[in-house]
Amino acid sequence: MIILHPSPLRKGVAPFPNPRHSLKGKEGSALALRPYDRQAAVLYAHEWAYGRNPKFYDYERIGGDCTNFASQCLFAGSGIMDFTPTFGWYYIDADRKAPAWTGVQYLHQYLTRERPSVGPVGKECQLWELRPGDLVQLRFQGEVFQHSPVVVQADHAQSTEEVLIAAHSYDADYRPLSSYGYEELRCLHIEGVRWPGSSPNL
């Protein structure tokens, strides 16, 4: 189901939440799983696939910008950051960000976490379970995954040719997943977004 609500990034450069007033999931706190706005995530991906939102640093020259872009899309669809030190998922500026915001492996660990905290949550899934707004991660060589494209089109895909992605480093939109030469693929389905139970509706 696609939920139509104003995304925090839809019209460019909305200010980020203040971490001093951040929403952290504390052990025992009430968290509600709410729908992920897939349409907002995909619209953001299309808007910035070949550009750079000036509210975010461009990591192209220092390791790549793919997971930074993926996190921006996730934020567009979730509307909340997790300012938990070290293990959270947030961006304040180029130097103040969580490892999960820009790191392929760290983002995977964050999305599939068991720790209760606010923010998007996901699980590894099969190719046919991918939906627009989900992520795929690719391993080209070595033992670690190195790329985090965003799914912009998929409908019970039976092959990677039927999954289209947007990405940074290298910039792409509507690119068939089959066009990548990778050794391993993992698919991440976003199940929803954890919010404090008392927070206003998205």
Per-range role (PLM):
Residues 150-202:
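Glycine-rich, aromatic-bearing surface loops/beta-hairpins
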Residues 20-102:
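N-terminal capping segments
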Residues 50, 74-75, 141, 154, ...:
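Residue-level marker of positions within ordered structural domains that often coincide
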Residues 90-165:
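...with weaker cross-activation on analogous glycine-rich loops/strands in unrelated enzymes
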Residues 1-3, 13:
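Short hydrophobic transmembrane-like helices used for membrane targeting/insertion
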Residues 6, 15-17:
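Intrinsically disordered, low-complexity segments enriched in serine/proline and basic residues
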